[in-house]
């Protein structure tokens, strides 16, 4: 028993240098989200469905080892109305979205470098949420209905950016994220006889500040 306890203590002490070697950061970013669109096909033709470009915010907690690998847990929120367009006719509905994901980062320079370009990839979940007021009549209802509901979807996250060390504990960075999800059919609901598929891309350029320790 004494030998077992000693091994546990020694193993725990052996992990201390590895934990101290990690450099942690907490940060926040603000930017804008720009969505791609998908066509809703119906017997009478097709309409373009998308989410309006709007402001986006993000917070994260990350860690970086002494090498070039790192990772971060992020939470993002974004405004953006649901939109349907065909010719000169448009339907819109108030909406927003939020997501949570984990990204693995690879840096092109070591931890001590003052400038660190990086790329990242990860996965998580995204919730699209209608916040508008449903009306008895909606333009382009024969293609899709924009609803006050929510749709939880899986999400793939891709990223690239550059980190700049302003001081020993302050970091500025510019970054671009590409968030991909299946089309949210529970909030942009195809009409009977209509169909829509594929994925939406949400491209989010942003500027950020982080505190490192």
Q: What residue ranges belong to the model's regions?
A:
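Cleavable N-terminal export/targeting peptides
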Residues: 1-23
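Short glycine/proline- and aromatic-enriched beta-strand/turn motifs that initiate or cap beta-hairpins
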Residues: 20-64, 71, 130, 204-213
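Transmembrane beta-barrel strands of outer-membrane/channel proteins
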Residues: 28-32, 73-77, 119-125, 162, ...
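Flexible, solvent-exposed coil segments and beta strand-coil junctions
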Residues: 35-41, 78-87, 133-143, 184-190
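Extracellular loop and loop/strand-boundary signature of outer-membrane beta-barrel proteins
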Residues: 42-48, 84-93, 141-148, 190-197
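Short sequence motifs at beta-strands and strand-loop junctions characteristic
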Residues: 49-55, 94-99, 148-155, 197-201
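Gram-negative (and chloroplast) outer-membrane scaffold detector with strong preference
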Residues: 60-139, 154, 202-213
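Predominantly the C-terminal beta-signal and adjacent terminal strand-loop region
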Residues: 80, 167-213
